[in-house]
Structures are given as C-alpha cells and as structure tokens.
Amino acid sequence: IRCTGSKECYSPCYKATGCPNAKC
C-alpha cells in the first residue's frame, strides 16, 4: 500500500506499513 496524497492520511493506508505520517 502506498500513500500518495493527503486524503490517504485518513484512510487505512495511514496506519499501514510503509505509510509514515511524514507523507501527510
């Protein structure tokens, strides 16, 4: 799973491995 946008911060991706909050 990858976080590519700010809206990902509020999805399961936010807590997924490889999706640090630094991406938000």
Curated annotation (Swiss-Prot):
Subcellular locations according to the entry: Secreted
Source superkingdom: Eukaryota
Single GO molecular function: toxin activity
Gene Ontology, cellular component aspect: extracellular region
Tissue localization of expression: Expressed by the venom gland.
Additional remarks: This peptide elutes at 21.22 minutes and comes from a fraction that contains 2 components.
Function: Blocks voltage-gated potassium channels.
Written domain comment of the UniProt record: Has the structural arrangement of an alpha-helix connected to antiparallel beta-sheets by disulfide bonds (CS-alpha/beta).
Protein known as: Potassium channel toxin alpha-KTx 6 OcyKTx5
Organism (species): Opisthacanthus cayaporum (South American scorpion)
Top-level taxonomy: Eukaryota, Metazoa, Ecdysozoa, Arthropoda, Chelicerata
